[in-house]
Amino acid sequence: MRFWNHHCDVAGMPGLTAYAGFTQVARPNKGDFVFVSAASGAVGQVVGQLAKIAGCYVVGSAGSDEKVSLLKTKFGFDDAFNYKSETDLGAALKRCLPDGIDIYFDSVGGATLDAALLQMRHGGRVAVCGMISQYGLEEPYGVRNLYCIIGKTIRVEGFNVNGYFHLYPRFEEEMAGYIKDGKVTIVEDVVEGIGSAPAALIGLFSGKNVGKQLVAIAGA
């Protein structure tokens, strides 16, 4: 089955990033407790759904109540929270994941990574594909809780999708089946016209988009 209509999202780099990071870096086990930051984004929404397929309990964070609702009603997350309305990220994680975190799929870094490290379970895995909260900062956030990776024997691994292109045939076959069976659904954020591109780009860094941000060009 071909699904080229999704080549900008789940069939392209966002989907392969989610697939490679979750299956090859995080290496899930059935029953794992999974936390996904930027969960309503193009990568995060796929990670969450793959986690559910793998039999995991999944919690996501997002930047609005609308996105939180989408995670739970559209993408099947077990729980979610709006990080912008939380005064204590650690408390939010403890509330949603009282038994701790086995897998943290990190796209934001900074304070969220710091809070997640404290909640990680022994032998936990952190798959790091982005640090969007840190891009462009004059003074990047200094992560304070790295000591947790020693006492809890946490494996923290950064990865780039470029190292996993060899998985594409297998990924394509599996993902096409998930979409056909309704196990994976996708939401895109599409704006019309090249004139909308600058605002759409800026919106990426303030969390305005839901899913993959696309610009539709007339006649394309």
Language model segments and positions:
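Glycine-rich phosphate-binding loop and adjacent beta-alpha segment
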Residues: 111-184, 217-220
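Hydrophobic/small residue at the entry helix of a nucleotide-binding pocket
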Residues: 14-17, 42-43, 111-112
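NAD(P)H dinucleotide-binding glycine-rich loop of Rossmann-like/cofactor-binding domains
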Residues: 1-38, 183
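Adenosine-nucleotide cofactor-binding segment
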Residues: 52-115, 138, 162
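Short acidic-hydrophobic, aromatic-tinged amphipathic segments that line or gate anion-handling sites
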Residues: 79-84, 189-196
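C-terminal capping/lid region of NAD(P)-dependent oxidoreductase domains
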Residues: 181-190, 198-220
